[in-house]
Design a protein with these regions (language model features):
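Structural signature of tandem-repeat unit edges
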Residues: 1-4, 14-29, 39-52, 62-75, ...
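N-terminal regions of proteins, emphasizing targeting and processing segments when present
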Residues: 10-11, 77-80, 122-125
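Pocket-edge structural micro-motifs
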Residues: 9, 25, 32
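Intrinsically disordered, low-complexity boundary segments flanking structured domains
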Residues: 6-10, 55, 101
Length: 128
């Protein structure tokens, strides 16, 4: 029997220390609000197995600068990176077809998004 691993909530060992989060192989999803307001997170390295990022998963991660999605992320939820004010660049595979409502709203440092498969950008996706 195969299991799906989804990160539901992230709690750092040292709340005041900046960390580089590495999700282990086998994780297929980051749940809604899993990293919400976790200012400790500086970067995220996701496994090939990741296919879904939930609503507001990284909302308010003000120190998040870099996100690495090496696999085939097909769904990124609403407000997933909202208010990630330090996020500068993010790259997705061709499997992502839609940038949902307010995905990067308030991500004021964002200057580059590579998403070659996107055919739909919903409202407020990049609103400053």
């Amino acid at each position: 029997m195969a299991y799906e691993i989804i990160v539901a909530k992230f709690t750092p060992d040292e709340p005041d220390e900046r960390i580089d989060a590495v999700l282990p192989d086998g994780v297929v999803g980051v749940g809604a609000k899993a990293f919400r307001f976790k200012g400790e997170v500086r970067s995220l390295c996701a496994p090939q197995s990741l296919i879904e990022v939930g609503d507001a998963a990284f909302d308010g991660c003000r120190n998040l600068v870099q996100v690495d999605f090496p696999g085939d992320v097909a769904m990124v939820g609403k407000r997933a990176f909202q208010h990630c004010t330090s996020l500068r660049e993010i790259t997705f595979a061709e499997t992502l077809g839609c940038i949902d409502d307010a995905t990067f709203q308030g991500a004021t440092s964002l200057s580059r998004v590579v998403a070659p498969g996107v055919t739909e950008i919903n409202r407020y996706a990049f609103q400053r």
